[in-house]
């Protein structure tokens, strides 16, 4: 980043004259950020570095120069991501998506009331009530959704912990602690074990310095840092330390080469906050649904408006009818139902360790077709564990299970005793204090990952390592360094009071070079060609499994030459380090989590492609991918085919290989077309040694294929990809704050298996929303048809506005919500992911089922009840046709019925309102059957069972509410609802039964003839 890419480039400093320019500028910036880190500071010699940054490498900057640079570059801090003001979030909830439909309904109601008030002396208040209720529904639901999201985002308020608070700099030769924000380019900085690196540094001197780069590159092993230039790629070279990574051990000095937003970490954070986030699938579904419902509402509204003008109504009356029909089509309760469904699912997911930040992401996870998963910590346990050992010329399997219930081997061999002693003594890792009651595998250790793995392995199989070390006290030690690649220590032997033992571990080939003999069955024998081949084969086999292999050897020092109290000199080496005895190998791996292979299998049967994207080594990545089933058994990569047929890789047709391992350096040179080719033609893909920017490129590639992509990540390096993906999933335990900020969902237990649970919940919520909507929309037909017949056939109004509201916001609410608790149908994880182009939340088939089939049967039930009651009161159906004008005439108090009885206006209205109540009750009765048939889309209700207790409660609740509204004293005045004869409740029963039988037969045909005509026309 140095001068070229660093200082002059500042994301914040770019402005353009006009809006269009700004957008182009922003796109250009993002493309700039997506490129690999451009930097040449790691290649410069120390003199060139000093000249470039005008700094004395021993004394640091002058205070004056530091102030000038600070004034020029600004503080060493990340620009916080732009946040949405709270009022904007609240308005989005009030006016977004579904709410718009209800607002339009409310405005139309007030308009209708205004027209009526202008025309009539005593206007009916129905439309006014309806408008107020609609507005109230939107406001209450909006507040509820806003509260839900605000609660989740509280958990997210972080980002502040990203920057280390203090830094140790050397200026004018003086060491001083300053606020990390005041560090400037060119500063000489010192870091030690436990510090966070305050800016991007070029190392000029170091002593055993190791840094943890896992949040940046995804490598779990601490990386050595030294002044040497070791790699072209600045992310891989040893002489650069990155802002906000942790120094684990040792000390180092370095020159600051970038600060704040210009650091590698800063670029990633800027990239993440600059990415455009697409709309969620469910938001698009709700938009599509609104268009459908609007069409369904406006078309009959306009048709009947024209018809009523033809029938001779005044145009003002026709406008009132038009508004009435449109409003009757608005499902008032549905907004609340959808919100509650999503909230319930989010709560259920939180119980299963998935924290959802925005409600709509719940469903996105269900429509996921590709998961790009990180390896370290998500698919694996993120703790190095001893996996295999080789001694006595045999490879033995160690126990890597989380509960230590796995493989065991014979621990009586004297060679194993020697090997375990070396691994325990030649080891600087220790358990942290106060963990006696915690199981060994879960204890925290101080020390490097490989040594901690050895410590736990020996503790489990041989008992306390501390006691072993106490019995064999250490008298000298040479720590591991990158030049000689071994670690050595000398101990007093417990089994021989006068002598010492020298124990050594390190890179296997280096250890073997020092050993002319090998220990087999406790006996030292010469290391001949045969044994060397055996060693080579074992080493290759373990290395091929992606494991990190260490060699162990020892030498019993002769007591004559090295008696107790001998002063061992580790600088001048006054003791032998050659002619040792080789004992064995131990190999370590970060093992897969127990539940992952099963979860990957579930993804496969659900049609979801799992791609591994990791910063780790290709061999390790491939081994883990095979271990968890991302590369399934029997599937080969190009390399495997070439090795099997013994031909060069260039001769293999890449299309023959189902699996594919792509190296980051190859990905760097690929065009988008080549990447698309790989994603299209290979079903099982592993990307290894990838950089953060490449993860983003991979996500965009998958999205170009039309996939809905979920990405998991824990490091800062993952945040751009998390933001760009359709759903970003961050890790709750190991995740950095930045990644949690960018994600839509957080896995509280860091376990890949929880994602699969999330996918199932997401699919379930989509299914259940469909069922809820189908249930809610069905009652629209028996609510609208009375109004239409009232206009066309001029009969007394069969169902009033107030009673419609009692259905939509009263009796239908709990049953509709209860469908959110419905268990999954048996095929939910066997289906292919939903195709967002063809499989809509509400499609034409659902509308035709709800309106054209079930809704019509319900309307018949309602009209049957209506005609029965009026006939019992003396008005036969033939007398009702055309009676409307006389019926509603306040001055007419002698209207005759079919038998010649005279009715006053008041008496007529009591009968009419009793009809409204009965029509309402019959809708409740037919909705019983509708609720039960909506439990399943394909299975029979008898297969699904009635285990949903909330649904049974919903049935009882809607019935109790209907009875209460009908029989409660005073309802005649408040809601104009009157008590019904018991027999009138039974009028709709046959229709309810008919709905149930009709739908069971339809589903039977669906199951018998999949893909047939019935499925094409009625499966929603």
Curated annotation (Swiss-Prot):
Which CDD domains does UniProt cross-reference here?
A: P-type_ATPase_Na-K_like
Q: Which residues carry this modification: Phosphoserine?
A: 10, 439, 450, 496, 559, 587, 672, 826, 940
Where does it live in the cell? Membrane; Cell membrane
Which cysteines form disulfides?
Answer: none
Which residues are exposed on the Extracellular face of the membrane? 107-129, 307-318, 790-799, 864-915, 968-982
- Topological domain (Cytoplasmic) residues are 6-85, 151-286, 337-769, 821-840, 936-948, 1004-1020
Q: Where is this region: Disordered?
A: 1-31, 212-231
**Propeptide residue range(s):** 1-5
Show the SMART domains listed in the entry. Answer: Cation_ATPase_N
Q: Please tell me which top-level EC class this enzyme sits in.
A: translocase
Residues reported to bind Mg(2+): 714, 718
Task: Please provide one cellular component term from the Gene Ontology annotations of this protein.
Answer: sodium:potassium-exchanging ATPase complex
Q: Which residues form the signal peptide?
A: none
GO process annotations (BP) = intracellular potassium ion homeostasis; intracellular sodium ion homeostasis; potassium ion import across plasma membrane; proton transmembrane transport; sodium ion export across plasma membrane
Map out region (Interaction with phosphoinositide-3 kinase) in residue numbers: 80-82
Q: Which residues carry this modification: Phosphothreonine?
A: 570
In which residue ranges is the amino acid composition biased (Polar residues)?
212-227
- Does the record's keyword annotation contain Transmembrane helix? yes
Annotated EC = 7.2.2.13
What is the annotated quaternary arrangement, including any partners?
Answer: The sodium/potassium-transporting ATPase is composed of a catalytic alpha subunit, an auxiliary non-catalytic beta subunit and an additional regulatory subunit. Interacts with regulatory subunit FXYD1.
Q: Which family does it belong to?
A: Belongs to the cation transport ATPase (P-type) (TC 3.A.3) family. Type IIC subfamily.
Q: What is the protein name given in its UniProt record?
A: Sodium/potassium-transporting ATPase subunit alpha-2
Starting at the broadest rank, the lineage of the source organism is: Eukaryota, Metazoa, Chordata, Craniata, Vertebrata
The coding gene here is ATP1A2
């Amino acid at each position: 980043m140095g001068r070229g890419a660093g200082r002059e480039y500042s994301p914040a400093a770019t402005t353009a004259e006009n809006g269009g320019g700004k957008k182009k500028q922003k796109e250009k910036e993002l493309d700039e950020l997506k490129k690999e880190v451009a930097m040449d500071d790691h290649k410069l010699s120390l003199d060139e570095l000093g000249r470039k940054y005008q700094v004395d490498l021993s004394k640091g900057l002058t205070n004056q120069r530091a102030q000038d640079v600070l004034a020029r570059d600004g503080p060493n801090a990340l620009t916080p991501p732009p946040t949405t003001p709270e009022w904007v979030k609240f308005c989005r909830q009030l006016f977004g998506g579904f709410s718009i439909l209800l607002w339009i309904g409310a405005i139309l109601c007030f308009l209708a009331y205004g027209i009526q008030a202008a025309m009539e002396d005593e206007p009916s208040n129905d439309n006014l009530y309806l408008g107020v209720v609609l507005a109230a529904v939107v406001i209450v639901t909006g507040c509820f959704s806003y509260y839900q999201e605000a609660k989740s985002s509280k958990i997210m308020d972080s980002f502040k912990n990203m920057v280390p608070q203090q830094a140790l700099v050397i200026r004018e030769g003086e060491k001083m602690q300053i606020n990390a924000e005041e560090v400037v380019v060119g500063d000489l900085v010192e870091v030690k074990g436990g510090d966070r690196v305050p800016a991007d540094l070029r190392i000029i001197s170091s002593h055993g310095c190791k840094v943890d780069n896992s949040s940046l590159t995804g490598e779990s092993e601490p990386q050595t840092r030294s002044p040497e230039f070791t790699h072209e790629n600045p992310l891989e070279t040893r002489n650069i330390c990155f802002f906000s990574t942790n120094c684990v051990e040792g000390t180092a000095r370095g020159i600051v080469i970038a600060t704040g937003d210009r650091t590698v970490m800063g670029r990633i954070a800027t990239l993440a906050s600059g990415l455009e986030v697409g709309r969620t699938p469910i938001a698009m579904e709700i938009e599509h649904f609104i268009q459908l419902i609007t069409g369904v509402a406006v078309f009959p509204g306009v048709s009947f408006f024209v018809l009523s003008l033809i029938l001779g109504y005044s145009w003002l009356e026709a406008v009132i009818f038009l508004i009435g029909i449109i409003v009757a089509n608005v499902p008032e309760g549905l907004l609340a139902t959808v919100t509650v469904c999503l909230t319930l699912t989010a709560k259920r997911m939180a119980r299963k360790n998935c924290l959802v930040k925005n409600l709509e992401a719940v469903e996105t996870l269900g429509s996921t077709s590709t998961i790009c998963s990180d390896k370290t910590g998500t698919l694996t346990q993120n703790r190095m564990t001893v996996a295999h050992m080789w001694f006595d010329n045999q490879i033995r399997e160690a126990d890597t299970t989380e509960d230590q219930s796995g493989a065991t081997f014979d621990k009586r061999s004297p060679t194993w005793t020697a090997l375990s002693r070396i691994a325990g003594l030649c080891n600087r890792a220790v358990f942290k204090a106060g963990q006696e009651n915690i199981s060994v595998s879960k204890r925290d250790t101080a020390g490097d990952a490989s040594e901690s793995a050895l410590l736990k392995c020996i503790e489990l199989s041989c008992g306390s390592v501390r006691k072993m070390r106490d019995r064999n006290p250490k008298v000298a030690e040479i720590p591991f360094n990158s030049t000689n690649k071994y670690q050595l220590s000398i101990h007093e032997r417990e089994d021989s009071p006068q002598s010492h033992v020298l124990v050594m571990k390190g890179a296997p080939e280096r250890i073997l070079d020092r050993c002319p003999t090998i220990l087999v069955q406790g006996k030292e024998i010469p290391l001949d060609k045969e044994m060397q081949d055996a060693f080579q084969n074992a080493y290759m086999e373990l290395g091929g499994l992606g494991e990190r292999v260490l060699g162990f050897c020892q030498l019993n020092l002769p007591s004559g030459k090295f008696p107790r109290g001998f002063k061992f000199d580790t600088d001048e080496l006054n003791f032998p380090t050659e002619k040792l005895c080789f004992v064995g190998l131990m190999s370590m791996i970060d093992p897969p989590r127990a539940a992952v292979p099963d979860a990957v299998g579930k993804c496969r049967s659900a049609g979801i492609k799992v791609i591994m994207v990791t910063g780790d080594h290709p061999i390790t990545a491939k081994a883990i991918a095979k271990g968890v089933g991302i590369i399934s058994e029997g599937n080969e990569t190009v390399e495997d085919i070439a090795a099997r047929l013994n031909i060069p890789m260039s001769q293999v047709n890449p299309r023959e290989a189902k699996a594919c391992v792509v190296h980051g350096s190859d990905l760097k040179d690929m065009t988008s077309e080549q990447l698309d080719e790989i994603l299209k033609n290979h079903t099982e893909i592993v990307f290894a040694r990838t950089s953060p920017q490449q993860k983003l490129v991979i996500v965009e590639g998958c999205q170009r294929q039309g996939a809905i992509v979920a990405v998991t990540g824990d490091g800062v390096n993952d945040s751009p990809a998390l933001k760009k993906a359709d759903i970003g999933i961050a890790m709750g335990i190991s995740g950095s704050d930045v990644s949690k900020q960018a994600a839509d969902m957080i896995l509280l237990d860091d376990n890949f298996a929880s994602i699969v649970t999330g996918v199932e919940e997401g699919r379930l919520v989509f299914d259940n929303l469909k069922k809820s909507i189908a249930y809610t929309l069905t009652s629209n037909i028996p609510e609208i048809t009375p109004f239409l017949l009232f206009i066309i056939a001029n009969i007394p109004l069969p169902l009033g506005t107030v009673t419609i509201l009692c259905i939509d916001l009263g009796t239908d609410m709990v049953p509709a919500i209860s469908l959110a608790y419905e268990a999954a149908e048996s095929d939910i994880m066997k289906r292919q992911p939903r195709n967002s182009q063809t499989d809509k939340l509400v499609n034409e088939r659902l509308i035709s089922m709800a309106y054209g089939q079930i809704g019509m049967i319900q309307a018949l039930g309602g009209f049957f009840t209506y005609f029965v009651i009026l006939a019992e009161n003396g008005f036969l159906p033939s007398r009702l046709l055309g009676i409307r004008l006389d019926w509603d005439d306040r001055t007419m108090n002698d209207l005759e019925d079919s038998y010649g009885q005279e009715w006053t206006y008041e008496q007529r209205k009591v009968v009419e309102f009793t009809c409204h109540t009965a029509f309402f009750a019959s809708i409740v009765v037919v909705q019983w059957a509708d609720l039960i048939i909506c439990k399943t889309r394909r299975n029979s209700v008898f297969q699904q069972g009635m285990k949903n207790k909330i649904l049974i409660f919903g049935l009882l609740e809607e019935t109790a509410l209907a009875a209460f509204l009908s029989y409660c004293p005073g309802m005649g005045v408040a809601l104009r609802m009157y008590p019904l004869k018991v027999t009138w409740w039974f009028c709709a029963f046959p229709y309810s039964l008919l709905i149930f039988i009709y739908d069971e037969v339809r589903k039977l045909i669906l199951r018998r003839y999949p893909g047939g005509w019935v499925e094409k026309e009625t499966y929603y």
